[in-house]
Structure formats: structure tokens, C-alpha cells
UniProtKB/Swiss-Prot annotation:
This is Cytochrome c oxidase subunit 2. Residues 46-59 are mitochondrial matrix. The gene is MT-CO2. NCBIfam families: CoxB. Mg(2+) binds at residue 198. It comes from Tamias merriami (Merriam's chipmunk).
Amino acid sequence: MAYPFELGFQDATSPIMEELLHFHDHTLMIVFLISSLVLYIISLMLTTKLTHTSTMDAQEVETIWTILPAIILILIALPSLRILYMMDEINDPSLTVKTMGHQWYWSYEYTDYEDLNFDSYMIPTSDLNPGELRLLEVDNRVVLPMELPIRMLISSEDVLHSWAVPSLGLKTDAIPGRLNQATLTSTRPGLYYGQCSEICGSNHSFMPIVLELVPLKHFENWSSSML
């Protein structure tokens, strides 16, 4: 989860989020090197009056600043495309959960079970217990098994929403009349918080998401108690 004054990403809890963190570091290194080079050239231009008389006809320089940016873009694009394909790949999911966005709450349906569905509303600040998080706790958590591929089907009943859980690397738009899908696999148990990430009206800030990732045995016990 996030911490006050946190500057970086949340701790990765899924293979996809780990890949995104590596890609972020890879891209940031390239951007830092380019920025340093540009600042160095600007500082040289400001601190010296020397000029190159052949700048208007420098074929070698033009060749370099054409080929070098192309190579840099390829170094950024290839890992990005790899992660995009990984995010879209869903092979034989162990569980499918349908998520519907409403103004202003979420509803969930476990499609592999005959009658397992519920609504998830934010708990008002006045009803919170000691230690619970303001604007992030819900009355019904989404309980899922860890270390298994899970498919999320995401849509909306009314306006645009966005179902996002940062520590799992998930952010999928909930669009009325359209069914989007995402996949998640948690590498460890715990509570993972998210929020609606698309402005959807006056109570947009009050649509938290809470995933409770548990071992498979605990999930089976929970699902049996809910049926």
C-alpha cells in the first residue's frame, strides 16, 4: 500500500508490476542520460564563445542525431511492447470475477459460482474501527486466491469508471456497454487497496477497492461460507 510522502511506486505484488518497475527504471536511466547530455551541451554553449564554422553542412552530425534517437526509441519500445503482450495474455484462468462500476460503488460477481455476488461500498469515516484506513475501507472485500491466474471482467452500469490497484499493476477502464478484461496473479497474501481512477461524478473519491489475497484453502472456506 501507499505511505505518506511516498515518492516511488508501491511494492510490487504481481509479476506484471515487477516488470513495470524494471521498465520504469530502464526508461528513467535513458531519460537521465539524455537530459545530462543536453544540459552539458547547453552549459558549454553558454560558457564559451567558440562556434563551429561547418555546422550548416555537417553530414556526420546529422547522421548521428538521426540514427542515435532511432536506436534509443527501439530500446524503449521493445520492452514496452513485451509488457503490453504480457498484460493481454490470459491462459486458462483459475477464476473469473466480473466487476461492475456504479455511481458510486463496485459490484462483484464470481462467475464460476452459481450465486456468489455482492456490492462493495466505502465505509464512512464515522464507522471506521481503530487502525482502519480513511476512504479506503469497504464493507465487502474481494477475496481471491493467491498464486493463481485470475481474470477480471470489468464494465460499468452508468458512466466511465476505472478499476485500479497500483500494487498489482492494474488499471482497466470500466465502460458502459463494453466488457474489458485484465489478469492478475498475486505472489503473496495481504490486503491491497485501489480506487476508481476515472472522474465519474461528485462521489468519485469514495469508490475504494480492497482485494484480500489469501491461500487457496482459505479462499475455499470463504467461498463456501458465502454460498
